[in-house]
Amino acid sequence: MAELGHQVAVLDIDEGKVASLRDGNVPFYEKGMDESLNRHLREDNLRFSTELAEAIPGADFVFLCVPSQSAPDGSVDLRALRSAAEAIGPHLSPGAIVINKSTVPVGSTRTVHDLIGRDDIAVASNPEFLREGTALDDFMHPDRVVIGAETESQQQRVAELYQSLNAAFVLTDPATAELIKYVCNAYLATRLSFINDVAELCEGVGGDATDVMRAMGLDKRIGPHFLQPGPGWGGSCFPKDTTALTSIAQAVGTDFQLLQEVVDSNQRQFDRVADRARSMVDNVNGSRVAVWGLAFKAGTDDTRDSPALEVIRRLLSAGITVIGYDPKASFAADGFTQVDSEQAAAIDADLLIVLTEWPDFSTIDPSTIDASMRVPQVFDTRRVLDLDHWQAAGFTCEAIGQVAPNPDSSSTVDR
């Protein structure tokens, strides 16, 4: 919002986080965020506070951007949203619009309005569609801006906040706006699960998933996005949003079996990847596996519901020692050691697995890796390596969506 020229006050209950942001330090990794934060601090149009009385009074718009995690039963835990709504109510200026950015179930806009308890305050839904790793660019160049409010005048007031953006605007009612975010994420998860199942089919029939997906992507009805097979999907949104949408459907008596199968397919993908990795090491108990990538995707340090960690946990449960590297993310577990380079992870390893698609991994010279490994073999679950190059360097290579090579023709170098 500061990038769009607005005066912004940010409120958070975490004193340490607020202090860090005041000092110009972003407490997480996001491309471009450090520069943007410090520029707006210098321009004095962005400030941070832990006090309601400092941040809320006088604001024309108040955004609620609180966590919305899954409850044990699969529904959305609304405690943070409820607490925030109750807290801000007495401090809101007459005529202000409260805008919910959090991904929350249908009906939450009405819930927030009821908790605020004031007829002179409007509440709107304005879901975010930011991707970790490209969040700033996504905000400034959105595909669409979705605004759900009870009246056209409220919709227009919120839309004016984004008037400098070149984007399509979807002005609708709150319930529809709330549903849009869930449906979008559920569809993307569905697409990924489908592609991973197709990749397994390719392995079974001897096809190559890369060519299949490329041909699919050239079809204008399908397009090229979200057609890359991998170790599964995860992150801060897809798992909780697919679960939440299933819960929402059940609450209104809608049979959404397809979405449940999407979730189940993803769990099977974690198992398939781990099982294939285990089959590539001679002695499961006591083997040593190197892992490149811990974050749920490249461009972030976020490991929430990371497919990489799902696979790592399965390997650890099988008694395999795992040595991991990631340029931004970190992880800790019994039997797991994190090191500070790709080469360090590969030392004495029986297998190298690529689990996150960091671009730097594709530039690694395999000749700097093979001599240090106990068994030079690689399993590329993200299809980021030039496997012909790695094979020429003496590696046995396998990849998601590609039939495993015949052991008799393997290029493995005996050690």
Segments the model singles out, each with a brief description of its role:
Residues 1-415:
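Structural/interface elements that position substrates and couple domains in central-metabolism enzymes
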